[in-house]
Amino acid sequence: MYKIFHENKTLVFPNIESEELKSGATIQESDTYDIEDLCIFLSEWLDDTDPTQTLIQQVSPVAVGEALRKTFRLAPAAGGIVVSGGKFVGITRKGIPDLPKGHIEAGETPEAAALREVEEETGIGKLKIERELPSTWHCYLRGETWELKRTYWYVLTTDDPLLPHPQQEEGITEVNLVGKDEVEAFLEGTFLSIREVLGPEILKIIKI
């Protein structure tokens, strides 16, 4: 199942996995009409203020991938959930509970970007990747351009003493350990994409 998040609404392609959307596939004649229709639909969906979940079925991954590339500028990112003693590291970015993440630089792998961004945003070093988590996809308007951000997520551990230092120039004001007593407030306050996609993983991490 492939989901795109925008503010408080979700677009769902239940029969498609995100890895099927890679460019380079051959476009069939039947896909051409779907691509045009999907581009129109995506534009209307972005303008719609109704906070609902919308399902799109019986469309080929090729058509979906091409429509997304025509509608959005792709902006890959990576981040991580740092685990320590049954808790995880959360941040407050511009007043919103969040997880450390950032853009993938040219020539950088998602894994390297996750390690770099988490250390930059939290001040926590000696990070190691334990496993990959599901990616999140969300879109936003930057200037006059719609961007679609895929964020690669990883569970991270560290041998470093947890002496966090928030990256204030990125709007981060707090870096905290989140445990059982704080997780409900974190998930309620964070972005819909994190709550829906990573929420179950977070609850496993802190053993709820």
Predicted regions and their residues:
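Conserved beta-strand and immediately adjacent loop positions that scaffold enzyme active sites
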Residues: 79, 87, 174
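Conserved Nudix-box catalytic region and its N-terminal flanking loop in Nudix hydrolases
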Residues: 21, 27-28, 83-119, 124
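Unchanged
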Residues: 103-194
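Short hydrophobic/aromatic beta-strand or adjacent loop that forms the aromatic wall/cage
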Residues: 1, 77, 149-153
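Active-site beta-strand termini and strand-to-loop segments that position acidic
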Residues: 82-85, 156-158
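Nudix hydrolase/Nudix homology domain
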Residues: 2-4, 15-28, 96, 167-208
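Acidic, metal-coordinating catalytic segment for phosphate/diphosphate chemistry
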Residues: 35-79
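Extended, hydrophobic interaction surfaces within ordered domains
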Residues: 5-53
